[in-house]
C-alpha cells in the first residue's frame, strides 16, 4: 500500500497512526502542500485533490475516515472496539472531530514548531475546549476504550495541538490528554512528521 501524505497534515498523521495500530506497512509519498506544483500533483493520486489518500493496487481510497474504515477491514476490526455500542460511539467521535472544532483549527493551527501559549480563549475556542473536555472525561484510560484504536489516533493529534498552545485539561480529561501525549504511537507520529518535513 502507498499512503499519500501532506507535510504538517494532521489527517495524514491520524491515518499513519491507524496504520501502525493495524500493523500495516505503508510506502509513504510526501506532498508539500505549500508548493503549487507539488499540490497540483496530488490529483495524480487523489480524485479529491486532498490528502491523505491510500493506493492499494488499482484501488484508490481518499478521505481519512474512509481510509481508516478500509484499514480496519484489512486488520479484522482492530481499529474499533469489540462492542457494537462502543463501535458506534467511536465512529461518532471520529466523525465529530472530522467535521468539527473549526475555531481550534483556524486559530490554533497544527505546527511542529514551538508556539506561544494562548493568553486568553475566545468564546468559540472556549466552547470547543469544553466539548473536548466532556469527550475526554469518558475515557476508560489509558485509552478511550479498553484498547487503543482509531479514536485515540484521531484525538491524540488534537491533544498535541491543545498542549502546544498551553491548553491543559483538568481531572479525568486531563489524565486522558496526558496519556495520549505519552503514547508512543503519537510520539512516533511526530517524529514521522518531522521526517516528512525534510523530504
Q: What do these predicted ranges mean?
A:
Residues 32-35, 176, 194:
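Conserved beta-strand edge residues that scaffold enzyme active sites
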Residues 1-121, 127:
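GST-like domain detector, emphasizing the conserved glutathione-binding G-site
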Residues 37-39, 181, 199:
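Short Asp/Glu-rich motifs
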Residues 191-199:
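Terminal-tail/helix-coil boundary detector
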Residues 101-184, 188, 192:
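GST-like fold's C-terminal all-alpha helical module
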Amino acid at each position: 500500500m502507498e499512503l499519500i501524505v501532506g507535510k504538517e497534515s494532521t489527517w495524514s498523521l491520524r491515518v499513519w497512526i491507524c496504520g501502525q495500530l493495524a500493523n500495516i506497512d505503508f510506502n509513504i509519498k510526501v506532498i508539500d502542500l505549500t508548493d503549487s506544483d507539488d499540490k497540483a500533483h496530488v490529483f495524480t493520486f487523489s480524485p479529491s485533490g486532498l490528502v491523505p489518500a491510500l493506493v492499494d493496487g488499482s484501488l484508490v481510497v481518499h478521505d481519512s475516515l474512509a481510509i481508516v474504515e478500509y484499514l480496519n477491514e484489512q486488520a479484522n476490526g482492530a481499529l474499533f472496539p469489540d462492542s457494537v455500542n462502543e463501535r458506534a460511539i467511536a465512529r461518532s467521535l471520529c466523525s465529530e472531530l472530522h467535521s468539527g472544532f473549526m475555531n481550534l483549527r483556524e486559530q490554533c493551527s497544527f505546527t511542529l514548531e514551538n508556539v506561544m501559549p494562548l493568553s486568553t480563549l475566545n468564546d468559540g475556542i472556549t466552547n470547543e475546549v469544553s466539548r473536548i473536555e466532556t469527550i475526554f472525561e469518558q475515557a476508560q484510560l489509558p485509552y478511550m476504550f479498553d484498547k487503543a484504536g482509531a479514536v485515540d489516533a484521531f484525538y491524540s493529534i488534537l491533544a498535541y495541538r491543545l498542549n502546544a498552545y498551553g491548553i491543559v485539561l483538568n481531572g479525568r480529561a486531563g489524565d486522558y490528554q496526558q496519556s495520549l501525549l505519552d503514547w508512543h504511537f503519537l510520539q512516533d507520529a511526530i517524529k514521522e512528521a518531522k521526517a516528512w518535513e525534510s523530504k
